[in-house]
């Protein structure tokens, strides 16, 4: 039997998957990783932990299937984008990875805006200068960690780094360059002028490769550490949200995917690059397609924060009932009416990326009274993410992008309550892929297509199928429209206060 290995370098875990070539998922395994925030608005991860996770996952997957490593025909890697990893002359990371939702470089964003006209930037990149862009983070490093920055020989992203550790051959994938703000969409290829604006020379970026292109082969050293066979082909991977959209079945014009992870991704498939400064544009895994997309900096991570900081008693009650805290709180909040008893939450716990591009925005809860309970806050948080997705969908419609099917995936999609709220707020049916294997499957599939082991992009439908369709309930529509209007108005009213809050002393 030949199989394909997919690896996903995620925010909270590293995931591995083995699939066969007939639509079968042979095994999955994961190891925890940790987002570290040493200071306000910082988001970092340990690249060494990612690699050690990979070295543990491969033997686990092989052991659980009884397969030998020689059965693995190819490897693909996906991950968060655009993270920032600095390597020295020896290829060793100089510091922890700076994550895509890191919002430290507020001043540098404004500095960069002063160096290049925003319209010129948009014409080149199809996007705007925002907290996702890599250049401000590199400018921050040059200013605040000059010794480290001065030693940097190579800059790359998360899945590119693991690919490099496997093959010894450095490269960057197209979507890292595009979301980093270094890719000229009009001309095709890296824009050296934009790279220089970040304070680095273009030779600090490895060669650019498209998803599915050969990236090299597993080295003897990597084979010894991971248990893979030396010489196993490694294929250039892809951004995790794009892999996830592909696995969800978004392979046709106007397919919309909402991804309920730690962050909240929303992705619309198109046959041409439809751009807007408020949104991001990416290459689809399938050649010739594009993905107009947005990302809420925090969605599921807000729920995790509520459980960790406010829900200790509820967590104990959930354990006693044999439930997860999230499922228990869903049950408690399910009988509340739309609007969470008069509470509206803005989920800007890490600032906000699209469509606001405001790293100074803060998480906000409005409407609290002494009669409110944690279940009200919980429902307000669920509704806030749905409102955030509705905001993005409104922008897509302003861009003259038609929205067809709505597909929901990732961990948060397991919540029936959250899915029903989302269908009601979007006023559209939501198709859930409950058994969605995640981005790792997309990476494995790309590995198969890149090596010729697989030959049909549409065959992804054999691996992931719709679990349930949530129909919008018209009786809730008006109430949600009212609450959504308040949600949108709240940010406009508070926007001028957020910078003042940011200037207060940090804990």
Residue ranges and their predicted role:
Residues 1-95, 123, 151, 223-224, ...:
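N-terminal glycine/serine-rich phosphate-binding loop of ATP-dependent small-molecule kinases
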Residues 5-6, 106, 113-126, 133-171, ...:
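Active-site core segments that coordinate phosphate-bearing ligands/cofactors
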Residues 23, 46, 75, 102, ...:
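Residue-level signal for inorganic ion chemistry
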Residues 27-31, 206, 468:
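Structural signal for short hydrophobic segments within the conserved structured cores
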Residues 64-100, 125-134, 163-184, 207-210, ...:
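Short beta-strand-loop/turn "lid" adjacent to the catalytic site in phosphate-handling enzymes
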Residues 68-71, 201-204, 402:
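Short loop/turn motifs at secondary-structure junctions
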Residues 206-214, 319-326:
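Short linear loop/turn motifs
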């Amino acid at each position: 039997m030949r199989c394909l290995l997919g690896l996903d370098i995620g925010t909270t875990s590293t995931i591995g998957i083995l699939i066969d070539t007939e639509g079968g998922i042979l095994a999955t395994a994961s190891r925890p990783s940790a987002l570290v925030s040493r200071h306000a608005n910082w988001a970092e991860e340990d690249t060494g932990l990612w690699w050690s996770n990979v070295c543990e996952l491969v033997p686990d997957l092989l052991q659980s299937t009884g397969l030998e490593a020689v059965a693995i025909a190819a490897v693909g890697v996906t991950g968060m984008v655009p993270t920032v990893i600095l390597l020295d002359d020896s290829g060793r990371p100089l510091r922890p990875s700076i994550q895509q939702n890191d919002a430290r470089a507020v001043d540098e964003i404004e500095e960069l805006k002063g160096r290049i006209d925003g319209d010129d930037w948009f014409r080149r990149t199809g996007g705007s200068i925002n907290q996702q862009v890599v250049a401000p983070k590199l400018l921050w490093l040059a200013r605040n960690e000059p010794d480290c920055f001065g030693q940097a020989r190579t800059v790359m992203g998360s899945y590119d780094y693991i690919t490099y550790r496997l093959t010894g051959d450095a490269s960057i994938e197209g979507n890292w360059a595009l979301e980093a703000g270094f890719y000229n969409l009009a001309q095709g290829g890296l824009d050296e002028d934009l790279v220089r604006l970040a304070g680095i020379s273009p030779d600090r970026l490895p060669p650019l490769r498209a998803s599915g292109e050969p990236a090299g082969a597993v080295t003897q050293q990597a084979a010894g550490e991971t248990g893979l066979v030396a010489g196993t082909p490694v294929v250039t991977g892809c951004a995790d949200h794009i892999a996830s959209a592909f696995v969800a079945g978004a392979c046709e014009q106007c397919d919309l995917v909402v991804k309920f992870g730690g962050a909240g991704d929303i992705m619309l498939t198109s046959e041409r690059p439809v751009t807007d400064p408020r949104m991001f544009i990416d290459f689809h895994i399938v050649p010739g397609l594009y993905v107009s997309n947005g990302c809420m900096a925090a969605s599921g991570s807000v729920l995790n924060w509520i459980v960790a900081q406010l829900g200790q008693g509820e967590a104990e009650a959930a354990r006693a009932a044999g439930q997860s805290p999230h499922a228990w709180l869903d049950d408690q909040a399910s009988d509340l009416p739309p609007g969470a008893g008069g509470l509206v939450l803005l989920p800007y716990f890490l600032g906000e990326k699209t469509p606001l591009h405001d790293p100074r925005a803060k998480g906000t809860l409005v409407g609290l009274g002494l009669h409110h309970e944690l279940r009200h806050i919980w429902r307000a948080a669920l509704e806030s993410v749905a409102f955030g997705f509705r905001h993005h969908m409104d922008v897509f419609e302003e861009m003259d992008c038609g929205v067809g099917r709505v597909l929901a995936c990732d961990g948060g999609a397991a919540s029936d309550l959250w899915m029903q709220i989302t269908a009601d707020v979007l006023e559209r049916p939501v198709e859930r892929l409950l058994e969605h294997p995640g981005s790792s499957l997309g990476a494995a599939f790309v590995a198969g297509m890149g090596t010729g082991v697989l030959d049909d992009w549409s065959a992804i439908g054999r691996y992931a199928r719709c679990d349930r369709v949530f129909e919008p309930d018209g009786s809730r529509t008006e109430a949600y429209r009212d609450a959504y209007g308040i949600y949108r108005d709240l940010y406009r009213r508070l926007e001028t206060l957020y910078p003042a809050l940011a200037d207060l002393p940090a804990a």
